[in-house]
């Protein structure tokens, strides 16, 4: 053994001892209650500040995860956990996701973070918007025939269009599934893709008619560049300052085939109403089994919303335009009530805007009725009405 090798080994051992000594010192400063999990996150670069520690479990009636952020010394505390067996892991910008570590409330668990071996691995956990921002925009000449121009285009491609329903830029949207089929180019693949499922007609109409087909070129270019290895130019910062005080609790409720359009837990005019009470979901077109979450006991129940008229239209009447890569041709959306906007009043009663009958209104609502409301504002057809959960 030569002297250089001995020096290297001694240096490595010294660094390891210093890291262990630092972690032990930092750990000693963490006060835990019996329902907390805490410890220190370190990597080969030392303590990892501003990274997320996730404690998750399937032991409860709902899938449950609580997420916290490490401080400047890499310390974390996941507080006030229900009694269960947890898997704890680390995610952070500049890191690859860590291995899962088993833990229970009351445990001190020091976690090993993994420095991302490449920029591509690091970018896998960047926010979806980092990836979506890579999409190029059409030229003014291309938009010359579009009423509203770029403002209208962006509105439909962002808040009032694609992003209304999809997390554009996540892994599912920034890649093209092989299950879609074989195509001459990615533009054709995107034209096929947006016809998937029961919303296929809506998506195709938005892009092909409202936006005159312009987005297909740019969607294709976007996914082609990503497939070729291009990465986001926007590299997000880790949480700083007060951002590190945020504790997020996530529960998976309702059905895998349903989606949540809205939820409500209180009267927004008086947010003390229904404190620690149930949270009421609105699944819009997907189902008439309205989900209810008990956030204290972590239970997931539902109530069946009924309509007044058996001829009320149903989302299940709409077939998939093309098969979904996830659900095939299944009509996974079946709602008649098609609710939005759950609201609680001052007494904790739950209100919805809901469809309760076919669109044609009763005669007393229409032109020629002597009803005061009809005389002021006659209506021949309506969509949603105000409904109360009884």
Put a short name on every predicted segment.
Residues 31, 58-77:
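Short, acidic Ser/Thr/Gly-rich low-complexity loop/linker segments typical of extracellular
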Residues 35, 43-59, 63, 83, ...:
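Short, ordered, surface-exposed loop/turn motifs in non-cytosolic proteins
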Residues 48, 77-85, 93:
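Short Pro-Gly-centered beta-turn/loop motif in secreted/extracellular proteins
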Residues 57-63, 85-102:
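A short, solvent-exposed loop/turn motif at the edges and junctions
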Residues 159-170:
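The canonical Cys-X-X-Cys-His
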Residues 172-179, 281-285, 352-389:
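Short, conserved, GDST-rich strand-edge loop motifs in beta-rich repeat architectures
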Residues 241-259, 301-334, 380-390:
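Surface-exposed loop and turn segments in beta-propeller and other repeat-based domains
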Residues 274-275, 344-347:
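Residue-level detector of Asp-centered blade-edge/turn motifs that repeat once per structural unit
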């Amino acid at each position: 053994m030569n002297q250089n090798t001995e020096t290297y080994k001694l240096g490595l051992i010294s660094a390891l001892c210093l890291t262990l000594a630092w972690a032990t010192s930092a750990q000693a400063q963490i006060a835990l209650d019996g329902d907390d999990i805490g410890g220190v996150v370190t990597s080969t670069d030392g303590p990892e500040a501003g990274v997320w520690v996730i404690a998750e479990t399937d032991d409860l009636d709902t899938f449950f995860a609580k997420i916290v952020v490490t401080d400047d010394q890499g310390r974390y505390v996941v507080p006030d956990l229900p009694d269960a067996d947890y898997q704890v892991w680390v995610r952070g910008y500049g890191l690859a996701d860590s291995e899962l570590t088993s833990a229970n409330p009351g445990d001190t668990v020091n976690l090993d973070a993994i420095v991302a071996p490449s920029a591509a691995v690091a970018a896998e956990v960047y926010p979806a918007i980092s990836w979506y921002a890579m999409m190029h925009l059409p030229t003014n000449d291309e938009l010359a025939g579009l009423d509203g121009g770029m403002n209208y285009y962006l509105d439909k491609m962002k808040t009032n269009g694609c992003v209304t329903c999809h997390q554009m830029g996540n892994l599912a949207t920034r890649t093209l599934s092989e299950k879609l089929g074989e195509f001459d180019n990615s533009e054709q693949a995107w034209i096929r893709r947006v016809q998937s499922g029961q919303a296929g007609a809506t998506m195709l109409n938005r892009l092909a008619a409202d936006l005159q087909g312009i987005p297909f070129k740019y969607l294709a270019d976007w996914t082609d560049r990503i497939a070729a290895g291009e990465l986001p130019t926007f590299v997000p910062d880790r949480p700083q300052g007060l951002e590190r005080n945020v504790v997020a609790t996530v529960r998976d409720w309702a059905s895998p085939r349903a989606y949540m359009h809205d939820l409500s837990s209180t009267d927004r005019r008086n947010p003390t109403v229904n404190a620690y009470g149930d949270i009421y979901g609105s699944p819009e077109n997907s189902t008439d089994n309205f989900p209810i979450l008990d956030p204290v006991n972590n239970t997931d129940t539902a109530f069946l919303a009924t309509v007044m008229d058996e001829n009320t239209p149903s989302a299940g009447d709409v077939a998939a335009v093309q098969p979904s890569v996830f659900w095939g041709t299944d009509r996974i959306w079946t709602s008649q009530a098609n609710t939005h906007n759950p609201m609680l009043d001052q007494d904790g009663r739950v209100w919805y805007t809901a469809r309760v009958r076919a669109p044609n209104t009763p005669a007393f609502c229409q032109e020629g009725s002597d009803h005061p409301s009809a005389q002021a504002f006659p209506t021949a057809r309506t969509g949603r009405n105000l409904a109360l959960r009884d």
